[in-house]
C-alpha cells in the first residue's frame, strides 16, 4: 500500500527531481512568479515554504542550510535580505498557486506559483525611477 508516502515522483529519478525542484526554487525566488504544471507547483510549495521560514532568522547556520538546498549564493542573499524580512510577521502561507488552464500540447493542467505580498511591477518601476 502507498499510504503516507509524502511526495510525488513526477516520473523522474531522485537526482533529477531534486535538481528540478532546486532550479524551480531559484527561479521562483528570482522572479517571484513562475508558470509550471500543477503537480510540480504543489511539490515546489513543499520546498519553498520551509526555506522562507528558515530565512526569517538570519544566522550563519541558516544561510548554510539554505545554500545546501539552493546552491546559488545570489538567491540565498536575496532570500535572507529581502524575502525573510518581508515575511517576518506572516506565520506561513508564503506562496499562492493559481490554476492557469491547460497546456496546448498534452493538455497538462498548468499553474502559476507566486510569492504573496510581492511588489507589483508598476510599483517596482516607480521605485527604480525614484532611486535615479
UniProtKB/Swiss-Prot annotation:
GO terms for biological process: translation. Coiled coil: none annotated. Signal peptide: none annotated. One of its GO terms (molecular function) is structural constituent of ribosome. Pfam families: Ribosomal_L17. Keywords: Ribonucleoprotein, Ribosomal protein. It comes from the Bacteria. The keyword Plastid does not apply. GO terms for cellular component: cytosolic large ribosomal subunit. NCBIfam families: L17. Belongs to the bacterial ribosomal protein bL17 family. Part of the 50S ribosomal subunit. Contacts protein L32. This is Large ribosomal subunit protein bL17. It comes from Ralstonia nicotianae (strain ATCC BAA-1114 / GMI1000).
Amino acid at each position: 500500500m502507498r499510504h503516507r508516502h509524502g511526495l510525488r515522483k513526477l516520473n523522474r529519478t531522485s537526482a533529477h527531481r531534486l535538481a528540478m525542484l532546486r532550479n524551480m526554487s531559484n527561479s521562483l525566488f528570482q522572479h517571484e512568479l513562475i508558470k509550471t504544471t500543477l503537480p510540480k507547483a504543489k511539490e515546489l510549495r513543499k520546498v519553498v515554504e520551509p526555506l522562507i521560514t528558515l530565512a526569517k532568522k538570519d544566522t550563519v547556520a541558516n544561510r548554510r542550510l539554505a545554500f545546501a538546498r539552493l546552491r546559488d549564493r545570489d538567491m540565498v542573499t536575496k532570500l535572507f535580505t529581502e524575502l525573510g524580512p518581508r515575511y517576518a510577521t506572516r506565520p506561513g502561507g508564503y506562496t499562492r498557486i493559481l490554476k492557469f488552464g491547460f497546456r496546448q500540447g498534452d493538455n497538462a493542467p498548468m499553474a502559476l506559483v507566486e510569492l504573496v505580498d510581492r511588489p507589483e511591477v508598476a510599483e517596482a518601476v516607480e521605485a527604480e525611477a525614484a532611486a535615479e
